[in-house]
Amino acid sequence: MCATPVSPSPESPRSAQAGAAASDAAAQPVIVRWRGLEDYQASFDAMRAFTGSRSFETSDEIWLVEHPPVFTLGQAGDPAHLLAADSGIPLVKVDRGGQITYHGPGQVVGYLLLDLRRRKLMVRELVTRIEQAVIDTLAAYNLAGERKAGAPGIYVSPEQPNAGLHAGAKIAALGLKIRNGCSYHGVSLNVKMDLQPFLAINPCGYAGLETVDMATLGVAAGWDDVAQTLAASLIANIDGIPAAVGLPQAGAITA
């Protein structure tokens, strides 16, 4: 359980200790874990277990994952947005916000396991920072992304020189769950993937919404490169300071 410490009285010697612990915890660097290709259910179960067992001193983490083909439906999602139930792609009902989306090979998924109370960060502000991290990531590859009011995620800007018919297409989706002041789930960015499965759903509940990837817009970068850039952008936007993230090796990489 993600605990928020109870503040003792100013006279108590434990007050300074609690304050120091909170300060130390907030100052801890975000740990980036490269989990690679992983079944969605395994990631989902691991996120819930991590969030349920963390303490106030637990370091925040970002998990970088690539999933085999899967549709996920948010807790208030309408199953009617799955247009082709016979696609052969499994559907997993999850506890994040939002409607239905697709995850598959060639998509970078970043799961944000953050203690928002410790960071004094509101959910709306976290969403804004995640979206800005995606915009910054796209800009690193000379792509222009933009927000749309009332529709979380990032879309191809009409200002993108080679956008053509893809202007307004969705290139990144996000959805979060907050439990006891801690976040899990996160953001997905389409790098180079088979986009056909998106035709079997109303992406994020929007009928006829086009979904695009970076490769379609002329970007030749690989999954690892984009994942590294996205992780650094997420940390920079969440912590407000530049971050360097190493490429995957073994275990965890601390940024």
UniProtKB/Swiss-Prot annotation:
It is found in: Cytoplasm. It catalyses: octanoyl-[ACP] + L-lysyl-[protein] = N(6)-octanoyl-L-lysyl-[protein] + holo-[ACP] + H(+). The active site is at C204. Transmembrane segments: none annotated. GO terms for cellular component: cytoplasm. SUPFAM superfamilies: Class II aaRS and biotin synthetases (SSF55681). Its EC number is 2.3.1.181. Gene3D superfamilies: Bira Bifunctional Protein, Domain 2. Disulfide bonds: none annotated. GO terms for molecular function: lipoyl(octanoyl) transferase activity. Residues 1-21 are annotated as: Disordered. The record marks K170 as: Lowers pKa of active site Cys. Residues 56-242 form the BPL/LPL catalytic domain. Belongs to the LipB family. Catalyzes the transfer of endogenously produced octanoic acid from octanoyl-acyl-carrier-protein onto the lipoyl domains of lipoate-dependent enzymes. Lipoyl-ACP can also act as a substrate although octanoyl-ACP is likely to be the physiological substrate. This is Octanoyltransferase. The gene is lipB.
